[in-house]
């Protein structure tokens, strides 16, 4: 058992050096990851700004059609009555 405990102790300092090298690689990978994260973030607001004007008129048109139908429904019978005798 004492022999088995000795090799892990020797291996731990060896593992420490790769760990030191790993953070350097991780730092290099983190910077590009941040750049890629910023690009989609910039594109998403632009897409929202572009889509918003298209969606808002569509919603406005729907709201206008609903209100227009209500007004037209009120005005339509009056116009129909007026147009009927003229025809």
Curated annotation (Swiss-Prot):
Q: Name one GO biological process term.
A: nucleosome assembly
Region listing for Disordered, in residue ranges: 1-87
Query: What is the name of the protein in this document?
Result: Histone H1.C6/H1.C9
Which InterPro entries does the entry link to? H1/H5
Name the species this protein comes from. Answer: Trypanosoma cruzi
- Tell me where it resides: Nucleus; Chromosome
- The organism's place on the tree of life at top rank: Eukaryota
Recorded GO terms, molecular function? DNA binding; structural constituent of chromatin
For this UniProt record, the keywords arranged alphabetically read as follows: Chromosome, DNA-binding, Nucleus
Q: Which GO terms describe its cellular component?
A: nucleosome; nucleus
